[in-house]
Every structure is written in C-alpha cells, then in structure tokens.
C-alpha cells in the first residue's frame, strides 16, 4: 500500500452569517484562520458569540452581529 501526502491549502469558500456557521468550520478572525468550537446567541438572536481555537490551540471568543458576514475557509488539494 502506497502512502501519499497531499498538499492542502486553505481557500475562501463562502461568506456566511453567524447563524449559518457550524462547529469545526474554519473562519477568518483578525487576519487568522481559526476553528469554530462553540456558537451562542443572545435571546433576540442579534448578537452571536463564536468561541474559536487558533493554530496554537489558544481559545478565544469573538462577537458578530446577526447581519455581519464571516469568511468561511476550506482545505483543498493544491496538487490538482
């Protein structure tokens, strides 16, 4: 069995509102792509608190208004 290593790179896939995000999504926060680990909103659904983890494993929270757009990233095979 041959083991192959593929080169993966991050690509901008979409711009989503906070209510469209899911756990494990990769989003842009302060010029850094991070992984979503939790999502919560206020009772009115107008403010979303997104907990995330950066590439060093450090966790933080960012807030978005319900009508803001968040850049969603995905890994793609750069060899194709």
PLM region spans:
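Serine/proline-rich low-complexity intrinsically disordered segments, especially terminal tails, linkers
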Residues: 17, 43, 48-51, 73, ...
């Amino acid at each position: 069995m041959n083991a192959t290593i593929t080169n993966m790179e991050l690509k901008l896939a979409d711009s989503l509102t906070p209510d469209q995000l899911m756990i494990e999504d990769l989003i842009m926060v302060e010029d850094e792509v991070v992984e979503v680990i939790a999502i919560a909103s206020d009772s009115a659904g107008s403010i979303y608190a997104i907990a995330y983890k950066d590439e060093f494993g450090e966790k933080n929270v960012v807030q978005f208004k319900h009508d803001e757009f968040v850049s969603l990233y995905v890994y793609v095979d750069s060899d194709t």
